[in-house]
A protein has these predicted regions:
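Bacterial N-terminal signal peptides
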Residues: 8-16
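Structural recognition of the beta-strand scaffold that forms the well-ordered cores
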Residues: 27-33, 62-69, 106-111, 150-155, ...
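Aromatic-lined carbohydrate-binding/catalytic grooves of carbohydrate-active enzymes
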Residues: 45, 49, 53-163
Length: 532
């Protein structure tokens, strides 16, 4: 079959995009049982934590959801209906949600997409067959219309056991949730890896990694796994790097990094410690009004890497208004040594004198022009609001782009990849794009290309390929040209550039690179230069 590539480009770009710049539902804030209590839960545990959320001031700070994880069932009856473990929850679930709601809070519950829950280990009878598969409609009606829960996390241990298709089953559950009388339910998918771009139409948030545990190694690993998938957060739908381990055994500097990164990345903030015994430092960090404002910002954006030196990363995002005067910036030191980095103000999108406000100490710390030297302890971070005159972004990394066919589900399913390479501009590039392993919709998009006035630009793309390749360019759904032949002489260590003139509209633009008929080059970055 012939592939009419330019027509496909236009159709693909016409599909709906996230509502960048518009107010969206913010990430979930609350608490969950699993990190501290695991399967050791009961009615009194939940009530005491709900009480503590109010008494500690966490509820006033914005934390609202009290979420029950795995372990509350007593199997499923012969009639197919779920049975509650009434020894653990003698008053019943509706009485419990009524109590939580009476405190001005919201209540969350847990299930599995498949048959058995993770906590059952596939053997404990209470957790066998209690998952959603085959019972999507009636279980949702029980959880939301009868028990009156406001949130649900849906795991996938039983989904794997039942050999289900993630997209098909999670979509079925999503539709069942939407069909309930109760509205406004928050749906969190827990597949322990980014599921694919389809998930934004199905869930409010989705886990991007395996389970967190209370150690610096876990926090660091999860941060690094999320650095280059920030394009998938947007439009009120969020990457979820898992619950918070703050208030347990992490060192203060490690807790700072944990909280600061989760906040700037617009991740859900679900406390995992015992709120009745939370240490003062951890409590104050969780209630930090500036970090919470960073997390709950009306734009709901991810925070891509704008500068990197080894394992010191600078990530940033707009606050309050796209291309406005205020940006959130977090500088993270993931190494085991004290580090100093000169933060490039131009890379942040500013020119002239700028104001640096430190979110951890709630004070202005510097006003001036030029780069700003930030010294950070091992495992630590600094979080800032930076305010000043903006300049148009001119350098867009491939690893901050949105990839239509990207997923992390494995199972020998093809996918484009974000890959490390120190010869790339910031040490990362994107490969396996174009028609590869049968993928025809395997394209790259920069969805947040901002032009203050609009007009003509020269776009210069840095690429690598060892054989002749080509790619199509489109802007805002309109085909521009096909770049061919492209050749650099090597796939990894020799980079070449190619230029093309494009026209941007005033405001936000989407630039797409694609080839539904053949493999594309590896892509490093693209630079925009306004025509004179």
């Amino acid at each position: 079959m012939k592939r009419h590539s330019l027509i496909l480009l236009a159709v693909a770009c016409a599909l709906s995009l996230p509502s960048f710049g518009k107010g969206v539902n913010p990430p979930t804030m609350g608490w969950s049982t699993w990190n501290t209590f695991a399967l050791n839960i009961n009615e009194q545990v939940i009530k005491s934590q709900a009480d503590a959320m109010v008494k500690t001031g966490l509820a006033k700070a914005g934390y609202k959801y009290v979420n029950i994880d795995d372990g509350y069932w007593d199997g499923r009856g012969e009639d197919g209906k779920l049975r509650l473990n009434t020894k653990l929850f003698p008053s019943g679930m509706r009485a419990l949600t009524d109590y939580i709601h009476s405190l001005g809070l919201k209540a969350g519950i847990y299930s599995d997409a498949g048959d058995n829950t993770c906590g059952s280990g596939g053997v404990a009878k209470w957790g066998l067959g209690v998952g959603f598969v085959g019972h999507e409609k009636e279980d949702c009606e029980l959880y939301f219309d009868d028990w009156n829960y406001d949130f649900i996390k849906v795991d996938y241990c039983g989904g794997n056991h039942a050999k289900l298709d993630e997209r098909e089953q999670y979509t079925k559950i999503s539709n069942a949730i939407k069909s309930c009388k109760k509205k406004g339910i928050v749906f969190n998918v827990c597949r322990w890896a980014y599921p694919g771009t389809w998930i934004s139409d199905v869930a409010d948030s989705w886990r991007t990694t395996g389970d967190i545990y209370c150690a610096w190694a876990s926090v660091k690993s999860i941060v690094k796994e999320n650095l280059y998938i920030q394009a998938y957060t947007g439009g009120g739908h969020y990457n979820d790097p898992d619950m918070l381990e703050i208030g347990r055994t992490l060192a203060p500097d490690e807790e700072n990094t944990h909280m600061a990164y989760w906040c700037i990345a617009s991740s859900p903030l679900l406390i995992g410690c015992d709120m009745t015994t939370i240490p003062e430092y951890s409590l104050n960090l969780l209630k930090n009004k500036d970090l919470i404002a960073m997390n709950q910002d009306r734009l709901g954006l991810g925070a891509p890497v704008v500068q990197r030196e080894g394992e010191v990363y600078v990530v940033a995002k707009d606050m309050e208004k796209i291309f406005g005067k205020k940006r959130a910036v977090v500088v993270m030191n993931l190494t085991d040594e004290v580090k100093t980095i000169n933060v490039d103000v131009n890379a942040l999108g500013f020119t002239g004198a700028v104001l640096w406000y430190d979110c951890l100490i709630h004070a202005d710390v510097y006003y001036g022009a030029g780069n700003y030297a930030v010294t950070i302890p091992a495992h630590g971070s600094k979080a800032f609001f930076v305010t000043g005159k903006r300049i148009e972004k001119t350098l867009y990394q491939a690893e901050e782009a949105w990839l239509k066919a990207y997923h992390e589900l494995g199972k020998k399913r093809p996918t484009p990849q974000y890959l490390p390479n120190e010869t790339a501009d910031q040490g990362e590039y994107v490969g396996n794009l174009g028609y590869v392993d049968g993928m025809t919709d395997n394209y790259l998009e920069w969805r947040n290309v901002y032009s203050k006035k609009g007009g003509k630009y020269k776009m210069t793309i840095r690429y690598a390929c060892g054989d002749q390749r080509s790619m199509n360019v489109s802007v805002n759904g309109t085909p521009v040209t096909t770049l061919t032949p492209l050749l650099s002489g090597d796939y990894l260590n020799k980079w070449n550039t190619v230029g093309v003139e494009i026209t941007l509209k005033k405001g936000l633009n989407t630039i797409q690179l694609s080839n539904p008929a053949a493999p594309m080059p590896n892509l490093d970055c693209m630079k925009l230069t306004a025509a004179k």
